[in-house]
């Protein structure tokens, strides 16, 4: 499980190490790859449109974030990391993928979702991009649907007290998730910084698209996805394997060139001996 990052787990600079609060043991991520999402669960988007989760799925992979809109700590960083990374990929929102940002707080309403979406589109440079506007949605819901989606995605969170003592904040992990077009969990990326390369590979895999770009093929082959850490990492064994095959081809080619007989040259025939 990827444990909670941020909130109470972060200590102010200079503060002595303290024991992690017991309630944080219940916050984290349990990666449920292949798990079907609750497509019948009811949500409401930033426009006020209400419908089953399937309403926001089509024939494209979906990148998802589970946050709460009134968060002033880690959630904005997760969304900023996502917008920055997506804007740097060559994939296009609406054409290649959809984005769903879902609130885990029943106090969040469509009005909050409107503001969050405006910020998201602005940070990605998509304010005047109609395709992006139609591909990015911020969802709110009741507790039953929130429980259904977070259970399916393995997103564990706990309500915790804020600075004023009110139980109006949440401890949770910083993570984004990827779902297949038919609504099954595909990948998780942890942290608050999501490199464009990682996002592109995760979306391509989630969409189960044919990999026709040689660069993508090489990267996917040279990289292992580690469910334990939620990151792509370079596999040294695979790189050495590729290097070994390339070396073998080069050596075989050199041997062939050095040993083949030149064409057009007849064998020499000894002529008559010269008389002195």
Describe the residue ranges of each PLM region.
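Extracytoplasmic
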Residues: 36-38, 58-61, 94-99, 133, ...
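N-terminal targeting signals for export/organelle localization
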Residues: 1-40, 44, 252-263, 272-276
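Structural microenvironment flanking redox-active thiols in thiol-disulfide oxidoreductases
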Residues: 79-146
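Thioredoxin-like thiol-disulfide oxidoreductase module
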Residues: 21-24, 109-121, 141-169, 210-211
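Juxtamembrane/start-of-transmembrane alpha-helix segments at the extracytoplasmic/lumenal side
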Residues: 226-247
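Extracytoplasmic/lumenal ectodomains and periplasmic regions of secretory and membrane proteins
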Residues: 12, 16, 162-222
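Short active-site neighborhood of thiol/selenol oxidoreductases, capturing the structured segment around
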Residues: 52-82, 99-101
């Amino acid at each position: 499980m990827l444990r909670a990052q941020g909130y109470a787990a972060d200590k102010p600079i200079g503060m002595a190490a303290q024991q992690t609060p017991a309630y944080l043991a219940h916050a984290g991520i349990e990666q449920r790859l292949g798990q079907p999402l609750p497509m019948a669960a009811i949500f409401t988007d930033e426009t006020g449109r209400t419908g089953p989760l399937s309403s926001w799925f089509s024939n494209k992979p979906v990148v998802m974030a589970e946050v709460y809109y009134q968060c002033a700590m880690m959630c904005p960083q997760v969304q900023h990391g996502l917008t920055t990374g997506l804007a740097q990929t060559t994939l296009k929102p609406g054409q290649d993928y959809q984005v769903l940002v879902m609130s885990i707080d029943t106090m969040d309403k469509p009005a909050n979702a409107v503001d969050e979406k405006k910020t998201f589109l602005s940070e990605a440079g998509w304010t005047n991009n109609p395709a992006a506007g139609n591909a990015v949605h911020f969802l709110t819901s009741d507790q039953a649907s929130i429980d259904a989606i977070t259970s399916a995605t393995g997103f564990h969170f706990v309500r915790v007290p804020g600075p004023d003592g009110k139980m109006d904040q949440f401890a949770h992990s910083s993570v984004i998730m990827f779902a297949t077009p038919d609504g099954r969990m595909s990948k998780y990326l942890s942290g608050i910084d999501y490199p464009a390369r990682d996002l592109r590979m995760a979306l391509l895999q989630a969409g189960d698209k044919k990999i026709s770009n040689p660069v993508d093929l090489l990267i996917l082959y040279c990289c292992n996805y580690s469910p334990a850490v939620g990151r792509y990492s370079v596999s040294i064994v695979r790189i050495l394997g590729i290097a070994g095959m390339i070396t073998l081809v080069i050596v075989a080619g050199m041997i062939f060139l050095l040993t083949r007989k030149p064409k057009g040259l007849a064998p020499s025939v000894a002529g008559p001996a010269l008389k002195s």
